[in-house]
């Protein structure tokens, strides 16, 4: 009986302590409300003295309340500083200092010696004599063959079919066990200008080989983040047969310039702007994001975009001279992670 009485008395003391803590919290909250309503803010030193640490408060409810107040005070100070800075900039007008640029990995990129200068004579000579010169001189028109690895599954097949609706004058062919070395001569004999091979692993597309015909080069990409049309939310209607516009972003080095020209050679020269379709290859930190959109003109001044799909991400693994040759091919560039990925601010495209 004595033990039961001790337990009841201890539980009664705990309940009294909880009530006292709750009353203290209510009084503190009421005092804060009165202070804010009267327009007089409590001094910061009284609320948060020097060396004050919220983590030292043992009462959980009290600690949570003080942390909430501290966050509110931080937001108010930040907003007040932003308003003050805005007023100062408006008062200075044109004499206001430029806005500070936030530091990002992109604008802190390590300078690459192979960065392309459009006015460089050497670059102009290379463009006039490389494998894509006949396309850019409008001597040839693109004709693309899209194929897969052996025994493709449904997801890879649907990706090929949807790519054929994005790239004009492209044809889907199922290999049926035929080796790539035998496919390439047949493509050249039938005047195909490019060959696209989509590889898969565990029923998921994971690689893309792009070979420019008849003389190369051949690029091998890792493919990830594949989304088919049905998997894209708020997508538009299926694309039309109009020739899309092509946008290439941030291909700045000599290697990136070659990859950009390779993508450009997949599409015909004169886009049909009436179709309002655009294919984008956006390079960011050596990842190439592919998107296919349609322009939506809401008014004379406002325009939006509507994604049509598919979408995927590419990362260059190697660039090989000539057509596909896995044994004796000469490689211009190969990605070596241990040697090349030594800095997060160094990019190759």
From Swiss-Prot:
Region named RNA-binding: 303-320
GO cellular component terms, A-Z: nucleolus; preribosome, large subunit precursor
Gene Ontology BP, a term: maturation of 5.8S rRNA
Compartmental location: Nucleus, Nucleolus
Region (Disordered), start-end ranges: 1-105
Gene Ontology molecular function terms on file: RNA binding; rRNA primary transcript binding
Lineage: superkingdom: Eukaryota
Listed SMART domains: Brix
Disulfide bonds listed in the record: none
Domain Brix: 142-325
Role noted for this protein: May be required for ribosome biogenesis.
Protein name: Ribosome production factor 1
Taxonomic lineage: Eukaryota, Metazoa, Chordata, Craniata, Vertebrata
């Amino acid at each position: 009986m004595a033990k039961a009485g001790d337990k009841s008395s201890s539980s009664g003391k705990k309940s009294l302590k909880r009530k006292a803590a709750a009353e203290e919290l209510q009084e503190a909250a009421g005092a804060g409300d009165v202070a804010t309503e009267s327009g007089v803010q409590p001094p910061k030193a009284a609320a948060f003295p020097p060396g004050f640490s919220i983590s030292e408060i043992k009462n959980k409810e009290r600690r949570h309340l003080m942390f909430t107040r501290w966050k509110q005070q931080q937001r108010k100070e930040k907003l007040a500083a932003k308003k003050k800075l805005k007023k100062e900039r408006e008062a200075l007008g044109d004499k206001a200092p430029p806005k500070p640029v936030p530091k990002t990995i992109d604008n802190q990129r390590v300078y690459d010696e192979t960065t392309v200068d459009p006015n460089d004579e050497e670059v102009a000579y290379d463009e006039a004599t490389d494998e894509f010169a006949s396309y850019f001189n409008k001597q040839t028109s693109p004709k693309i063959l899209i194929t897969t690895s052996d025994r493709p599954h449904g997801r890879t097949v649907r990706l090929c079919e949807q790519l054929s609706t994005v790239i004009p004058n492209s044809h889907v062919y199922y290999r049926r066990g035929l080796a790539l070395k035998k496919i390439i001569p047949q493509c050249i004999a039938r005047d195909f200008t490019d060959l696209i091979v989509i590889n898969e692993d565990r029923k998921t597309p994971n690689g893309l080989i792009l070979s420019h015909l008849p003389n190369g080069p051949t690029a091998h990409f890792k493919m990830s983040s594949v989304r088919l049309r049905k998997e894209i939310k708020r997508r538009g209607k299926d694309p039309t047969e109009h020739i899309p516009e092509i946008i290439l972003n941030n291909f700045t080095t000599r290697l990136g310039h070659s990859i950009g020209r390779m993508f450009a050679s997949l599409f015909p020269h004169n886009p049909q702007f009436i179709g309002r379709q655009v294919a984008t290859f956006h390079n960011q930190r050596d990842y190439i994001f592919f998107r296919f959109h349609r322009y939506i003109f809401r008014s004379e001044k406002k325009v939006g975009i509507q994604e049509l799909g598919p979408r995927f991400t590419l990362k260059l693994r190697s660039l090989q001279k000539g057509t596909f040759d896995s044994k004796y091919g000469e490689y211009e560039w190969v990605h070596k992670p241990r040697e090349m990925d030594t800095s997060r601010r160094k990019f190759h495209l």
